[in-house]
A protein has these predicted regions:
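Juxtamembrane helix-entry segments on the extracytoplasmic side of multipass membrane proteins
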Residues: 1-6, 61, 110-118
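Membrane-embedded alpha-helical segments of multi-pass membrane proteins
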Residues: 9, 60-67, 88, 92, ...
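C-terminal membrane module of polytopic membrane proteins
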Residues: 87-145
Length: 145
């Protein structure tokens, strides 16, 4: 159990914090200032984020995840939003890997992904809808203040 806690702290929390400070807090901000095109800055930082993970088959999902974190930062104005999202994502991966390595209901975990294409599409649509709704809520909040 202590190995899980140590992994969540190192891989989940510290890596999420460090990567977001670099990719969104520094790189995306520099790109925004230099390019003056916020969407291009988000996607440039996401591209570099995905490329520097050096995983060919995970490039596109990581690119989308990087863009998600980039827009979360852009729209919220707070680096803590993508830091928390990144830390939660990394911590979930660590926890699932730990459960798989410790044979904790591995059969049920395998069945959970049997509809992965449908689940991935539905998840992507719901995520985009939530991001658009979040942006609208932020825009409405700024108009009333």
């Amino acid at each position: 159990m202590w190995d899980l806690i140590a992994s969540v702290v190192c891989v989940g929390l510290l890596t999420g914090l460090g990567e977001e400070m670099f990719f969104r807090g520094a790189l995306q901000r520099i790109c925004c200032d230099g390019m003056r095109r916020r969407h291009l800055a988000v996607w440039t930082a996401a591209f570099v984020f995905s490329t520097l993970h050096f995983q060919f088959f995970g490039f596109v999902p990581r690119l989308v995840l990087g863009a998600f974190f980039g827009y979360a930062y852009l729209w919220s104005g707070s680096l803590w939003v993508p830091v928390i999202g990144h830390a939660l994502n990394n911590s979930a991966v660590v926890a699932f890997m730990w459960m798989g390595n410790n044979s904790i209901d591995a059969a049920a975990m395998g069945e959970a992904g049997s509809q992965s294409a449908v689940v991935a599409i539905v998840s992507a649509v719901v995520t985009v809808a939530m991001m658009v709704a979040y942006k609208k809520i932020l825009a409405n909040g700024k108009k009333t203040h």
